[in-house]
Design a protein with these regions (language model features):
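Transmembrane helical bundles and short interhelical boundary loops of multi-pass, membrane-embedded
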Residues: 7, 11-35, 39, 48-53, ...
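Luminal/periplasmic active-site loops of membrane-embedded glycosylation enzymes
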Residues: 56-104, 229-238
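Hydrophobic, aromatic-rich transmembrane alpha-helices
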Residues: 103-139
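Membrane-interface catalytic loops of GT-C/OST-like multi-pass glycosylation enzymes that act
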Residues: 112-115, 157-170, 215-219
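Membrane-interfacial loop-to-transmembrane alpha-helix junctions, especially the N-terminal start
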Residues: 120, 136-148, 193-201
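Hydrophobic/aromatic-rich transmembrane helices and adjacent perimembrane loops
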Residues: 163-185
Length: 238
C-alpha cells in the first residue's frame, strides 16, 4: 500500500519523495528501513536464546526453516483442547489461554493470555471509523488497516485448521490497534471537547494493563490458589 500510494503521487521519484503516501514526511526508503528491515531484525533477535540451546539449537541463518517448522507444529494439533476457541470469540475477547498457574519459587503465580478488555472493544469502534474514514474521507491509511484486519479474520472461518487458539488473533489485533491509534489521532486533531477522549482512552488502557499485569506476568499473587478469581471477569476466561 505504501509503495502504491507513493508511486501514484510521485512516479519515478517515489524512492526519496517525502510527500504523499499514507504517512506524510516519510520516504519510501525510510519506510523500508523502519517498517521492513528493523522489524525483521528484531524478529530474528527474538530467537537469540534458541540459537544457543545445548540440544538442537536453531540455525540462525535459516529463518524460513523456522517458519516451516512452526507451521508443521501448528498443523499437528488436531485433538480437542480445553483452551481452544473460535475466531468470533477472539473478537469478543471471550476466551483465554492459561500457560501457568501454580506455586513457583515460594509464591502462587499465573500467566494468562488475554486481550486488554478495554482496548479490544475500543478497537472495534475504531475499526468501524476506519472503514468509514477510508471510504468517505479517503483516509487510505485507516482503510488499509481496516481491510487488512478483516482479510486476516476472514481466513480463519475458512481455514482447514480444526483447533484454533486466541494467540492466532495476535496479528489481526495488531491492525485493530492500528485503527485505534489512527482514530485517536483524528480525535486529538479536533478542536472541540471530543478531543479529550484521546487521553482518556490512553489512561484507561494503561490502567487496565496495570490491573491485569500481575496475572499475565507471573508476579507473586496474594491469596493462594483462589487468587486468580480477582481477574476472572468472565467464566470463559477460567
Amino acid at each position: 500500500m505504501f509503495l502504491v500510494l507513493k508511486a501514484r503521487a510521485h512516479g519515478r521519484r517515489l524512492l526519496l519523495a517525502r510527500g504523499g503516501g499514507p504517512v506524510a514526511g516519510i520516504t519510501l526508503a525510510e519506510a523500508a528501513l523502519w517498517l521492513g528491515a528493523v522489524p525483521l531484525a528484531l524478529y530474528w533477535l527474538s530467537f537469540w536464546p534458541a540459537f544457543h540451546w545445548v540440544q538442537n539449537p536453531v540455525d540462525p541463518w535459516r529463518p524460513l526453516a523456522w517458519q516451516e517448522f512452526m507451521i508443521r507444529l501448528q498443523d499437528s494439533v488436531v485433538r480437542p483442547h480445553p483452551y481452544r476457541s473460535q475466531w468470533y470469540e477472539w473478537i469478543g475477547n471471550w476466551r483465554a489461554i492459561w500457560y501457568l498457574y501454580k506455586e513457583v519459587d515460594g509464591a502462587q503465580r499465573g500467566v494468562v493470555l488475554i486481550g486488554n478488555p478495554f482496548t479490544m472493544y475500543a478497537g472495534l469502534a475504531a475499526l468501524a471509523w476506519a472503514l468509514w474514514a477510508g471510504i468517505r474521507n479517503q483516509r487510505y491509511d485507516a482503510g488499509a488497516f481496516a481491510v487488512t484486519y478483516i482479510a486476516l479474520m476472514v481466513m480463519w472461518p475458512l481455514s482447514g485448521k480444526p483447533i484454533q487458539f486466541i494467540y492466532h488473533y495476535l496479528l489481526p489485533s495488531t491492525f485493530l490497534m492500528g485503527c485505534l491509534a489512527l482514530g485517536l489521532e483524528a480525535l486529538w486533531r479536533r478542536t472541540d471537547r471530543w478531543r479529550w477522549l484521546t487521553p482518556a482512552v490512553l489512561a484507561i488502557s494503561c490502567g487496565m494493563f496495570a490491573w491485569f499485569y500481575p496475572i499475565i506476568s507471573a508476579a507473586p499473587l496474594a491469596g493462594g490458589k483462589p487468587a486468580f478469581n480477582h481477574w476472572m471477569w468472565l467464566a470463559s476466561w477460567r
